[in-house]
Amino acid sequence: MQITHYLPTTPVSKPLTKNKQISARQIAFAAAFLLPAAKFLEAPSILSKHAGGDLLLPAIVHFLLQTLVILAVLYAASQSKTPLIHHLKSVAGKAVYPVYALYALYFLFSAILPLLDAEKFVYAAYFDTAPTLFSFGVFFLFSAFVCTKGIKAIGRCADLCLFLFLIPFLALSFMAFSQTDFSRLLPLFGTRLAKSASAFTHSTPHFSDGVLLLPLIANLEYKEKDGAKIVAGYGFGALLTLFFLAVFYALFGSLAGREHYAFIKIGQYFPALSVVGRIDLVFVYFLSVVLLFYTCLPLQYTTQAVCTILKTERKTLVSALLNLALLVFVLFFNRHYNTIYNLISGKLTPVFWLFANIFPVLVLFLPKQPKSKQKPQNTPPRYALKPKNRGDYTQKGGR
């Protein structure tokens, strides 16, 4: 009796969703609900000090500039057949390691002000008496743990920030709204252009955070409409920040330049607090968690870059050494905050323009990937017969 053999057809493999490094939705959430958190500490008072009622103008220019940078990187990602980081490695080869080294140093440099701001914020918000020398040291334990995690962990944190950020933001804005006077923002363009330019320059370290999205975009398996989602997320975060700045100045007016750590103060003027107590602190706690995630983000990138350069998987050791060094730095240099801030936001401002605005745009000049001439490996031979029952690859017929 003739025996007929059926050859199975091999299905084309597809990337599993659960194995993706990060999704466009998570990057959009990071842009909308994670990046704005750090702008609620010192940025409002700095903009108010230099630009007065026109504090929104330099902020808008910052957001437009960062949006152009993000659009450039997204366009490069859309033209790449693989995640942008793989394309960069294939083009640059070993030359990619100096790029990693430069950005590891930049992310470490850009984390200095957020670290010092976070320390002062914690002391001002949560300590009624003078804190001990190591009170802020707990943060570095948290940071050392977070820095050992990969891109997936950042995506999960972004998902959490949807609730940790948006609900407290709306609640605190509502508490302050009854005491605001938006006429304090008038007249529009009433500040001299030189002062607005000064506000733009001094606030550059606080608004040059679009670069924090670039490692996420570089690891994204780009699909259609991913760019629109990410840009929409960044735009939504920008609108929330602009609204907060308007509420802040409408609340404090000419005194806004002296009011530091804005989001812990705007809720204090809610009339019902005398009856229900300081419920505004509950929302401040939630925003503080988002602030911790944000502060850890550049340190996490630095850890990943150092491990890549050294070709080691000992992230725990690298993270521990990095955070120990930062703890020592904060302990010894926090008393020189004003000097460090004036240096970074003054003479060292071009560092942010170079690494956050100029270098990322260079990905537009990456050569395109050549088209593969190889035939698909998973294509079944023409003579293969499809079995009647799926998975039935046994012999047909009896003996």
Regions found by a protein language model. Give the residues of each.
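Membrane-interface loop-to-helix entry segments
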Residues: 133, 146-176, 346-359
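Hydrophobic alpha-helical segments and their helix-loop junctions in multi-pass secondary transporters
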Residues: 108-111, 115, 147, 163-189, ...
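Extracellular/periplasmic helix-loop-helix junctions in multi-pass membrane proteins
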Residues: 310-317, 331-352
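Membrane helical hairpin/interfacial module
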Residues: 40-132
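Membrane-interface "cap" regions at the ends of multi-pass membrane proteins
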Residues: 1-44, 51-53, 219-220, 366-399
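Membrane-water interface regions at transmembrane-helix termini and the short interhelical loops
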Residues: 49, 81, 120-123, 141-161, ...
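Membrane-interface interhelical connector segments
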Residues: 251-280
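Hydrophobic, membrane-embedded alpha-helices of multi-pass small-molecule transporters
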Residues: 21-43, 58, 62, 66-69, ...
